[in-house]
Amino acid sequence: MSKKKFIDKEISKYVLRRDYSKIEKNFNEPNLLNLQKNAFHKFIDTELEGTIKSIFPIKSIGGRYSLEYIGMKLEKPKRSEKEARNEGKTYDRPLYVDLAIVDNESGEVKKTTKSSKNKASNTDGIFFASIPMITEKGTFIVNGIEKFVISQIVRSPGAYILTKSQIKLSNSRKRIQEGYICEILPAKGTLFFIFMAENKDFIQVMFRDAIGESTHTIPITAFLKALGLNKEEILNIFANHKSIKNSLDNEIYNEKDVFETDELINLRKNLNSSDSNRSYGVDTKLRELFKKYSSLKSQLEAEGKNAEKQKELNEVINNIISEKAAKDLVINLSISTKNIDSKFRLSNKETTYQSIIYNHFFSNKSFDLSKAGRFKMARKMRLSERLYQRVLAEDLKDINGKVVIKKNTLIQKHELDTIKQLTKEGKLGIVHNVNLDERISKMANVVKYEKINVYQDNDSQDEFIPIIGTDTSLDKPTLSISDILSITSYVINLDYDIGFYDDIDHLGNKRLKLIDELLKTRAQAGLVRIEKFINDKLAIADGANKSQEQSEEQEPKKSLTVKSIINTKPFQISFKEFFNSHQLTQFLDQQNPLAELTNKRRISAMGPGGISREDPNLDIRDVHYSHYGKICPIETPEGMNIGLIMSLATYASTDENGFLITPYRIVKNGVITDEIRWLTALSEDEYIIACSNLNVEKNKFKEDKVLCRYRSSWEFFDVKDVDFIDISPKQVVSIAASSIPFLENDDANRALMGANMQRQATPLISPIAPIVGTGNEYKIAHDSGMAAVYDGEKDGTVSYVDGGTIKIKSGSEEKVYELTKFNKSNQNTCNNQVPIVSVGEKVTKGTTIADGPAMSNGELALGQNVLVAFTTWSGYNYEDAIILSKRLFMEDIFTSIHIVEYSVDCLKTKNGDEEITRDIPNVSESSKKYLDDEGIIMVGAEVKEGDVLVGKISPKGQVELTSEEKLLQAIFGDKSKNHKETSLKVPHGGEGTVAMVKRFKVEDDYELNADVIEQIKVYVVQKRKIQIGDKMAGRHGNKGIISKIVPVEDMPHLEDGTTIDIMLNPLGVPSRMNIGQILELHLGLAMKKLTLSKVLELYYDKKPASDFSLWFGIHEEASRNLIKNLEKILNEKQIKSLDQANKEFTDFDLSLALSRSGISREKLIYKTATPVFEGVNRTDLKEAMTEAGIDPINGKLGEGKSGKFNLIDGRTGEYFDGEVSVGIMYMLKLDHMVDDKIHSRAVGPYSKITQQPLGGKSQNGGQRFGEMEVWALEAYGAAHNLRELLTIKSDDVKGRNNTYNAIIKGKPIPESGLPESFKLLTKQLQGLGLQVSITKELGKANNNNFKDINEYISNITNNAIKNDEDQQIIEEMDI
C-alpha cells in the first residue's frame, strides 16, 4: 500500500480519472444487488419446495386416507419482462404441485392429472400460485409496475441478559419486570423470562398465556419439575445454591404439599369408584400414576421396608409431582391439548400433561428458535462467555482425565482460547448428563450440559459457584432443557458479577429478514389454511365427522380426488397480498440510477413485528459503534422515519443466519495479508481492528503502535496485537454518501441531506459526469440496473449498433440487446438508453454497452459542472436562494424530460358497452382537433389542459324510445340523448406532446380485467427547462430555490470575460459547516484549467485518437476531428512546441477547435477522483491549483489569491468589492419543480358535508383562509374582504352561484347570503335545547325582545345593584 499523490486511473475505455486515493485495494467489490437476488433464488431453488413439503403427508383422523407429496414444478413465465411492463401484467411463473391421495385400506393411489381447462400447461399437478419472479435488475414487475421488497432489520431470536424487560399483552397492556433477567425470544412462540427480582432471592419464570391476556409467574424449580427433573437432580446440578433452595421453598411441588391439594384428595376418594368405561383424556396418566402410588404404598405398609419398592415408590412420587406441576402450568397458560406432535406422545394415542409442555416449549411447530436463535443461544450460553477473568475452583481435565488447566488459575485470553478449542473438538471433560425418568428421556432424548466450578470471589477463594453452559453440540432450532439450565445458571452468576448484560441496540443482536424469509413466512401462512381445509375434507371422507357421514343408502359414494379435497386460494392470496400491499413491498424509486440502487440496498426497522414510526425512543434510532462497516451512519431520512430507515454500507452483506457482515483483511504478526474474512458485529467485538488509512509500506505498518478500535473505543495498540485491518475507508458509509467528494470536510447533518438529495436529482437531457468525483460513479451506474451491460461468458465483438439495438458476436453466437427507449419510470422521468459502443469494438463480460438516464460514458451523471461564485447580488440570493445565468436556460443545460401516462378503460356496463369514438356530444371541435377517425389522439400532437386524449361515450340508463325517435337517431346519429361523454382529457398542468399510444383489446388476445373491452394508454411528454421556483442543490447539502434568471450580459464575469453561471450566498457556508463544497469549487476549477494543458500534452506527444477518447470521454471520430482542428489553429498561430503552446494557446482557442469539431466545451473535461476519507488533502489541493496556474497562497501568478478572483459586475462594468471564490461545482436539478407545485383555483369542487372548497392541487382545491388569518383581517377591520372570504368564496351556496352568474354576465356582484357554517351553528345551539331563530331586519321583529348588550351593561352599573344575581353577572363580565 504505497502512498502516492495521484495516478491517472483507467476506469473503462471511455473513462479516466486522476485518482488521489492513498490506499491500494486488492479486493473484488461484490455486485451491489447480489444480496436480495441471491436470497430470492435461494427461496425458489430450495426453500419453496421444503416449505410446501413440510405439511405433507396429511393423514385423516381415522387413518384411512393420506395426501402424499410427489413433487413440484415452476413453469416458464407466460410473458417476458417487456411484455409484462407494456401490458400492465405481472412477470411471474405458475407453480404446480403434484400430489397423490392414498387409500390405506384398499391401497389405491390417485394422482393429479393435467386439467383439460389448463391448456397452457403440460404439467400434471394442482395449480398452487403464480409467483412473481425477480428480474436481472433485482426487481419485481407486478401489474406492469416495478416493485422492490426492502429488507427488514429485527431483533434476533435467542437469549438476552437484561436489567429490565417487558411482556406485551392484549389491549396494549404491558407487564414490566426489573432485576436480573434472561429474556428467551423465539422466532415463533411465546416470549418468557427467567429472572431474579430485585427484592427477592430466588429465581422465577414469567410466561405469557397462550391467549395473551395475562402473565403467570412460578419458581424456576416448579418449571424444571414440570419438565421431569426431581428435587435431588436440581440441587445436584446447581450445587445446592441458596437461590435454588429458596425457589424450592417457594413452591408447592413436593410430596407433602402435592398430596394435600384438593385435586389429589378427590382423586384418592374416587379412585376405587371410577367407571371403567369412562375416558379421562389427558388426566388418564395422572390417575394411573396415583393408582400405582396407592398400590406400592399399600404393599410397603404390608411388607415392611423394601429398598427396591421404596425406590420405585419415590420414582412414582416424582412422576406425580412432575405431572401435577405440568398440569397446573398447562391450565394457567391456557395451552391447547390438541395437535400434540407424535414424538412427544408416550404411545400413539396417549397424551400427558408433560407431553403437552414438551410440545409447547420444545417443538419447532409451536416454539421455534430458528437457526439464528440457536446460534445466538449457543454463543450466549457457552461457558467461555462467563469464564474470562475468573479463578478456577477445580482442575480442568480432558476426557482422558489429563489436567489441562490447574485449579486456582486465572482464566486469561490464552486459557480461554484453549477451552474454546477443546470444547469445539469435544475433548474437554466438562460435559454431564441430566438424570431423567425413562419416559421423559423418550421425549427429551439425552440432555447434556457443561459445568465448571469457579470461585465466587477471585480474591477470597473460599466458596465456589458452578458455571453451567448449554450443550454446544445442539443444532436443532428448538429450545432444550440444557438451555433452561444454563440460563438459570447465568441469572445466578449475575449476582456475583459473572457474565455480561446485553446491549439491545448492538447489531450482533439484530438480523436482516431478506426476501426469502419474508416470502417463506407468507407461504407458511397460506399452507396452514390449506392444511386445515384438507383435514376437514379428509375427516368427512373417512367418516370421522359423524354429522356429515353418508348413510349406507346413499351409496355409491363420490370418488375422492385430490382436486376435491384441496383449495389453493389461501396460498395464492398470500403471495398476491405480499406483492401488492405488504409494508415492505414498495414502488421502485426510479428517479435516477443512484435512487434505484439505494432503494434496493435500503433496510427498514418498521414493518410487521417491527418498530412504529411514532415510537419516540432515540436509542433505537441512534448510530451504534457496531454499525461500523455494516450500516451507514449518514444516510437516513429526515423526519419521523429518522434512524428507522437505513442504508447498507458499501461492502455490507449477510451471513447464513441473517447477521450483517463486512470484510476485513487479516493481519498476522504485524503483516497485512491479502486474505479476506467477513465478520459479524459480535465477532468484531473479540478482535482488535486497525483503520485502513494508516502509514503502510510493503504490507507492513511504519509505526510500532497504530490507532485501532476495540469494541466501542479507539486506542493505540502494538502492531503485533492487531488482528484485522479495514479494506477501505469508504466501507463505513453507503454508496450515496461515498459519492460525495470531500465528505470528511462536511458536517454529518449536511452530508445526510447531500446523500438524500442526490437521490432526488432529475436526469437531464445531456448529462455530464462530475469533474470532481469519488471514483464510485462507474460502479454505481453499472450495478444500478439502468445501464445495458454485456453479460456473455466469452469476450465478444460489437457487430451492429443503432439507437435501439446492439448486437454482439461471440464466436458463432450473437447476442441482441434491445435498448429501453423513452420509457416512463415510476417517478415519471424519462428512462432512455443510448449506446456507447461502436461497431468492431471488443467487449468483455460486465462491460457497460449503453448509458441509461443520468449516465455519461457509463458513469453516474446526475447534474452539470457549472461555474459558481460565492457572492451576493442585489439580495436575490437571500436565504439560500440561487441566481442563475440565462445561458443555462437557453442552452438546455438543466433541461429534463418527463413522461406522464394517462389510461382509460372501455367497459361493458349493465346499460350497454362503452364506445371509443370521435363523435363526442357536447365537446367543441377545437378540443378534439387532434383526434383521429377512431377518437384517439395522434402521436406528436401538442396538447394542453382540457384537450381530449381519447373520445369515449358511455350509455345512460335505459330510456324507452318510440319507433320514430329510434329512426331519427339512426338517421342523424344523435347520441347525446342516450349517451354521456366520459372522455379521457388532459388534466390540470398536464400539457405536453403525445409520444406514444398503446391499445390493448380483448379481441387481440390481451388479458384485461373483467368487463374491460379495450384499454388505451396515452403517454404525454413534457420538456421542462429550468425556471424560477425550481429547486437545485450541490452534493454537500447546499440546497436552494432559483430566485432569478439573469441575462448573460448582466451576470458578473471574470477579468478574461468568462461569465459566472450560478451565484450562491456565501452566508450559507460557515454556519452549515459543509466546507467540502468550497474544496470541490477550487479543485473543480483547477481540473478545468488543467484540461487545456492535458489536451496540448496529448497532442504534442502524438497520442492517437483513442487516448483522447479515454482521457476526455469523447468518441474516436470526434477525437480525430479535434486533432485536425488543433493542428490547424496551432499552425495558424505558428506555435511549434508544447512550452510555447502553454503560453500562447488560450482557452478561447480550445473552444474554437472544439466548436469546429462538434464537441461541447462542457463535455471536454479532465476528471478527478477524490475518494472519501482518503482523497485530496490540503497539500494535494495546493499542488493541483498551482499546477493549474492558480496560486493558492500569495497570488503571484496574478490570477487569483487562495482561489479567489476579482469579479466585474456585468450591469455596471465595475469591480466587486473584495475578491470572490469562483470555481467549478457540480449542481443538481431536483425533482421539486415549480411546475408540479404551483396551482391556482377559480372554480372547482366543494366538500359535500361542509360545502367548502376542497384543498390541494390534486383536487383542484383552494388555499385555506384559516382561523388565524381571519383574526388578522379582523384586527385591520377589513370587513368587505372578510365578508367575501366567509361567504361567497367559502360555503354560501346560493351566493356563490349568483356571483358566478353575475360575473359572466358582467353585472355587479350581488349581496352575499347565509353561509352553511352559520346554519350549522344554529343547529348545534338547537341541539343544546336553545330556540334559535334568524330575522333579517331588526325593525320587523318585536323590539321588546332585543336588548343592546352595551346599553344593558351601562344601565346596571349606573343603578344600584339590586340583588346577588346582577352582582354575579357583573363579576362574570369582569366589570
UniProtKB/Swiss-Prot annotation:
One GO cellular component term noted in the UniProt record for this chain: DNA-directed RNA polymerase complex
Record's keyword annotation contains Transferase: yes
Reaction catalysed by this enzyme: RNA(n) + a ribonucleoside 5'-triphosphate = RNA(n+1) + diphosphate
Family annotation (SUPFAM superfamilies): beta and beta-prime subunits of DNA dependent RNA-polymerase (SSF64484)
PROSITE patterns on file: RNA_POL_BETA
Protein family: Belongs to the RNA polymerase beta chain family.
Function: DNA-dependent RNA polymerase catalyzes the transcription of DNA into RNA using the four ribonucleoside triphosphates as substrates.
Quaternary structure, from the entry: The RNAP catalytic core consists of 2 alpha, 1 beta, 1 beta' and 1 omega subunit. When a sigma factor is associated with the core the holoenzyme is formed, which can initiate transcription.
UniProt name for this protein: DNA-directed RNA polymerase subunit beta
UniProt organism field: Malacoplasma penetrans (strain HF-2)
